[in-house]
Structures are given as structure tokens and as C-alpha cells.
């Protein structure tokens, strides 16, 4: 299994969530976050924003679907300008459902 953490622009988050749902990825965690990338913020007119609001989507998928999910997120979240996000992928050894105590997705 893979844990996918996608940090995207808030304006694209619902579009990404909808695209994931249409592809069968219904289970995810969504949270508002603040951060910055390599650009170290952004300057608009005379105001410098050190950190920018983003939305983080976290989901766990089977190994054989991870690449398709990553492609879907990058395609949907793309805006053509800097600061449109980052995707982090990590291995997941086990996942448990609290209610049933069962292991797996």
C-alpha cells in the first residue's frame, strides 16, 4: 500500500476530490494547511506572503493503483503557474479499521 499526500491549491481541491471519487478513490482525509515551496512565498504588489494557504489530501491506495492516482491528481491540480502543489508518496506497512479491528483497506 502507498500513502499519498497531495498538497494542492485550495481552489483546485474540490475538483481533485471529485476526480478521485469518480475514479473510485472515495476514502481520503482533507485538511487546510499553510506552507511554502522553493519560491519561499510570493510577492503581490508591495505585499510579501511568506506562506500560502494550501489543502492537503491524504489517501492510502493499493500499490498497483498508486501511479494512476498520482497521474489523476497532477492532471487535475495543474494550473500552469508556480505554486500549484506537491505530491509525497510513502509506503504503508499496515492499515487497521478501528471499528472492526480488521487489517487492510
UniProtKB/Swiss-Prot annotation:
Keywords (A to Z) from UniProt: Nitrogen fixation, Transcription, Transcription regulation
Query: What's an example GO cellular component term for this entry?
Result: cytosol
Example GO molecular function: ATP binding
Question: Is the keyword Transcription regulation assigned to this protein?
Answer: yes
A biological process (GO) of this protein is: regulation of nitrogen utilization
- Gene3D superfamilies per UniProt: 3.30.70.120
InterPro entries with a match to the protein in the record: N-reg_PII, N-reg_PII-like_a/b, N-reg_PII/ATP_PRibTrfase_C, N-reg_PII_CS
Q: Which Pfam families does this chain map to?
A: P-II
Q: Which SUPFAM superfamilies match?
A: GlnB-like
The similarity comment for this entry is:
Belongs to the P(II) protein family.
Q: What does this protein do?
A: Could be involved in the regulation of nitrogen fixation.
PANTHER family xref list: NITROGEN REGULATORY PROTEIN P-II, PII-LIKE PROTEIN GLNBI
Protein name as annotated? Nitrogen fixation nifHD region glnB-like protein 1
Q: What is the scientific name of the source organism?
A: Methanococcus maripaludis (Methanococcus deltae)
Q: What is the lineage of its organism?
A: Archaea, Methanobacteriati, Methanobacteriota, Methanomada group, Methanococci
Amino acid at each position: 500500500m502507498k500513502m499519498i499526500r497531495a498538497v494542492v491549491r485550495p481552489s483546485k481541491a474540490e475538483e481533485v476530490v471529485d476526480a478521485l471519487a469518480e475514479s473510485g478513490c472515495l476514502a481520503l482525509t482533507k485538511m487546510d494547511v499553510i506552507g511554502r515551496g522553493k519560491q519561499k512565498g510570493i510577492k503581490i504588489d508591495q505585499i510579501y506572503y511568506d506562506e500560502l494557504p494550501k489543502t492537503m489530501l491524504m489517501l492510502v491506495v493499493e500499490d498497483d493503483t498508486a501511479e494512476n492516482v498520482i497521474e489523476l491528481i497532477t492532471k487535475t491540480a495543474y494550473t500552469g503557474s508556480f505554486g500549484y502543489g506537491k505530491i509525497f508518496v510513502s509506503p504503508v506497512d499496515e492499515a487497521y479499521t478501528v471499528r472492526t479491528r480488521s487489517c487492510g483497506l
